[in-house]
């Protein structure tokens, strides 16, 4: 059992907050374990003036972290799992998906108005095609405009008057201690969460069995089942940041309830689907459910 490991993390305030929270939990769960931190600036962090669709997608937020694993500068990396593509390098694996934070979206408005109360023509910032589709469906009279930058930057653009509102992940606000900034938490019926939203993915080298065992200490079985189903939808529809796609799985009594949606990049041809399955005994069953639902949406 290793006693000293290095974790790789992005340098943003949110990435550091969630990485350090995971590190504290892991050190508390594994006696005599000591963790070092390697801060990495990713390609996605370097380019803030263009949309993710233009610069190559969400994989840009993990590329340099994976390089740190492959060249052995780090033993594991902490990701927001919604930034992790369906396919990762063969030499790497997702060794742990810890318990999930609240996956819902949050609306932050300057005036304190709820989504239904924003005036026609109000400017709402989001660079997520998924969120843009949800906003246009709920309020076609709003003006949806792209916004990049970290959480603080996006909030500042609201309170400086650049936007009337922005939509952010509630999990990110919570991890930064900014939950009180949320004017309204959007229900999944209004804004179906992004695939894996609110969950972390802990990645390491596939061959490092001892590291995988240590990381697995914090794996949450229910979150792993749910996120596996959601990620299977993404793989089936070949989803990326260029595709408005969402999937959200929850445990509903004794069943796994999976909801998903898919649209064209311009928001047209929006289709929704959902399925239930007796709570699966392993991730393969959850992945089959997600793959079947994704195939249904893709045929659409």
Curated annotation (Swiss-Prot):
GO molecular function, one term: hydroxymethylbilane synthase activity
Cofactor: dipyrromethane
Organism: Sorangium cellulosum (strain So ce56)
Keywords for the protein's UniProt record, in alphabetical order: Porphyrin biosynthesis, Transferase
Stored HAMAP family: Porphobil_deam
Function description: Tetrapolymerization of the monopyrrole PBG into the hydroxymethylbilane pre-uroporphyrinogen in several discrete steps.
GO biological process: protoporphyrinogen IX biosynthetic process
Name of the featured protein: Porphobilinogen deaminase
Taxonomic lineage from the root: Bacteria, Pseudomonadati, Myxococcota, Polyangia, Polyangiales
Catalysed reaction equations from the record: 4 porphobilinogen + H2O = hydroxymethylbilane + 4 NH4(+)
PANTHER family registered for this protein in UniProt: PORPHOBILINOGEN DEAMINASE
Modified residues (S-(dipyrrolylmethanemethyl)cysteine): 241
Assembly and binders: Monomer.
Residue stretches in coiled coil: none
Cofactor, how bound (note): Binds 1 dipyrromethane group covalently.
Entry annotated with the keyword Transferase: yes
Enzyme class, first EC level, given as a word: transferase
Matching InterPro entries: HemC, Porphobilin_deaminase_cofac_BS, Porphobilin_deaminase_N, Porphobilinogen_deaminase_C, Porphobilinogen_deaminase_C_sf
Top-rank taxon: Bacteria
NCBIfam families, sorted: hemC (TIGR00212)
